[in-house]
Amino acid sequence: MATPTQRTPIQIVPHFSRLQEWIALDEGFFQDEGLEPMMLADVMHAVSSHHGDEYKRRPQDLPFVQQMEVVNSACQWGTACNAGAEMGKLVPDLYTVGRFAIFSRPGSKIQRLVDLRDVPIGIGERAGSHFTTLQVLEQILPKKHIRTVHTGGPGERLVALLRGEVEAANLLDPEIAIAEARGLRALARGEFLITFWVGPTIDKGVLKAYFRALKHANEVLSLTPEKYMHLWERNVPPALQDNYDYSAFGLGEKFVFEPYTEEMFQNALQFAEKWNLHTYIQDNTYDNLISVTGI
């Protein structure tokens, strides 16, 4: 194994809805690949806990606005739109599948999605919760009766729900498990694609090593999940820390080591355009916005 001075530094924003980055760190998989990981957990918690910052001022945007060489993830729509808005690039070699769920606040009379007609739903603007809420509700409600409110990150959305500040909100992992533990009612559940969102100047060899480490972490998580469930504690934002049964939190995002194709990319952009969420895009050419690693 290379010594710390021989390893290549890499700045990683752990994704709050999975464990693979933490497993790779604790098991030494990054180091085995010649990397010296800098885990930006403060950014992860800021993403989860922000109160509704504007686009390009959100915590997830700032590393890219500041031109840091960072590795992050976002929903497929977000990564595509962000890359098109000159914030990072999309890695097309793989993707993950995450969970979302729309919950109502404690004591709410809302029991079904149809009850959300003209009811503001807490989301993170131009992020996975926003796009998935629109996808779900457009199937049963006229567009003019779908309401969303930019409540902030997923941790902040659950805090707002528990305080009764919003009638309903879209949550991700680990907030889904926390909401369930606190007895909140789920109105809808689903899954969505998450893609890797990286600084445009990161060396391809460094990215390839990073993904090899994540693949190794994914393999050991699949083999002995019970060994790693305690790591969810690291992803719970400070405002929601408690003594949870982390064995009930599940495995988080599922990795799919298959290409995120141009067709998938264009479909994501078309959905964003349908809801007028494409307005920051300067370039929508797939080949210009991807960073191929060849894993």
What is each residue range found by the language model?
Residues 28, 164, 183, 276-279:
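Short glycine-centered helix-capping/turn motifs at secondary-structure transition points
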Residues 204-279:
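Secondary-structure end/capping motifs
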Residues 1-11, 138, 148-169, 294:
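Long, low-complexity, intrinsically disordered polar/charged segments
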Residues 153-235:
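Pocket-lining segment of extracytoplasmic ligand-binding domains
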Residues 45, 78-79, 176, 194, ...:
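Positions that flank functional sites
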Residues 273-295:
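Conserved C-terminal helix/tail region of periplasmic/extracytoplasmic solute-binding proteins
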Residues 75-76, 173, 225, 260:
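Short secondary-structure boundary segments
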Residues 2-143, 148, 186-189:
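Short, glycine-/small- and polar/acidic-enriched structural segments
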